[in-house]
Amino acid sequence: MTTRNPFSRRARLPLAVSLASSLAAPAFGVTFNIGEIEGSFDSALSVGASWSTAKPNKNLIGVNNGGKGLSQTSDDSHLNFKRGETFSKVFKGIHDLELKYGDTGVFLRGKYWYDFELKDEHREFKDIDDSGRKTLAKSSGAELLDAFIYHNYAIGDLPGSVRLGKQVVNWGESTFIQNGISAINPIDVTAFRRPGSEIKEGLIPVNMFYLSQNLTDNLSAEGFYQIEWDQTVVDNCGTFFSQPDVVADGCDQNLAVLTNNKASINLLNNVLAGAGLSVTPSPWDEGILVRRGPDRDARDSGQYGFALRYFADELNTEFGAYYMNYHSRLPIFSGQGASASTMAAINDLATRLAAINPALAAQAAAAATAGNSSYFIEYPEDIRMFGLSFSTTLPNGTAWSGEVSYRPNAPVQLNTTDILFAGLDPVSIGGNRPYDNASVLNGQAGQDLHGYRRKEITQLQTTLTHFFDQVMGAERLTLVGEIGWTHVGG
């Protein structure tokens, strides 16, 4: 009976690059038998550190925080770390366990980590807080990754494999560039930031059913159906790579707008309190707080895909064709305007106040609207993807691969500043609308303003990989280059 290794096509993904030193990275494994059960246990441990090599850029720090930028919703990382400081000092481990009985087996993978810099050290602007965060975004923790059963079989002489459980499935030929064919699994972004990270640490397995089957000696088919949806885990707010500060779970008090002057906010609240329109200042004096509403996660059902692969002997090349329907793993920032009744109260108060102090009326209306609006994170559903790929080896031994992907309805994030200022559209002071042109988007009282538009996106990319043996005392040097082109249509 001919079988194939069910783990032979592990995903390739972009690695975050930073100045990092891996101080130790021992790896070891053991094999064992329990009667007729074959087992293996592999482990990898590492200790590493990363440093900031540039001073904070004032243009990326909001004016309310002493910089020159227009927003303070994405500057915490610049305020927390100075040039020369470590932003990560981490110990981590990852372990694989496989148990196999004949052609059937189970595979488990888990990891743990502890970042001493983020967990134990004090930060200059905002301390790193793990409260309410996703486990994978925390400064320390442990997580079960893969957990699936598999069975290898053959129909005649044609091998096949089936898997069920939490797993990673990789399609396409991308190595570094994202948003290509490989979109089945979400990403643990934080894991890729850590020094000494491995690809298997940063891919988030999800529950799915997966089947692969050879149809001929040269043609094979694959398919999957996901049983659950999961999201990409982004950097915790305030960490070195965090961008922006308002998306990660638990980072609910970081979206602050308008004035950060305490006296001005107190004056505005004195005016607004009588009408029940008080606003909340940011805990870090960054401005007036815009509340975060509940996330709107995608549904679990409706995610599936199919692939065909053909190996052309005469060309020594494998070709692939793919179709996938999936829900976004990436967060979209969206807004919800103040309710119609709240806007009516704001406009009534501002109109009466304008007879006494027009400037204060406009400020009060803007503050009350912002402080009584909210934002939310959502994940658009039913994204369709079509793809083609090839992979070959050139006569000089260089591996050459490439792919093209097409999404007719990919969600593209709108400018978040436009989303926020669109919430001021309904402000009306004595019939005048002072913020009518504050945004290119149109906001309405109490209505959702979805922060994306569906666009056609086509992406081409190609990769070259060459191995050089026995270089400068190393057994092998790997040189990888990748180039891509992305077109956003109407």
Language model regions located:
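Transmembrane beta-strands of outer-membrane beta-barrel pores
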Residues: 47-53, 103, 112-116, 166-170, ...
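Residues on the lipid-exposed face of transmembrane beta-strands in outer-membrane beta-barrel proteins
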Residues: 43, 93-99, 108, 146-151, ...
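Solvent-exposed loop segments that connect transmembrane elements
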Residues: 59-78, 119-133, 185-194, 237-290, ...
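Residues that define the transmembrane beta-barrel architecture of outer-membrane proteins
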Residues: 37, 73-77, 87-93, 140-145, ...
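Outer-membrane beta-barrel channels and translocator barrels
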Residues: 101-104, 154-158, 204, 216-218, ...
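Transmembrane beta-strands of outer-membrane beta-barrel proteins
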Residues: 39-47, 104-110, 160-162, 221-223, ...
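Outer membrane beta-barrel
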Residues: 100-256
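Transmembrane beta-strand segments of Gram-negative outer membrane beta-barrel proteins
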Residues: 32-73, 106, 110
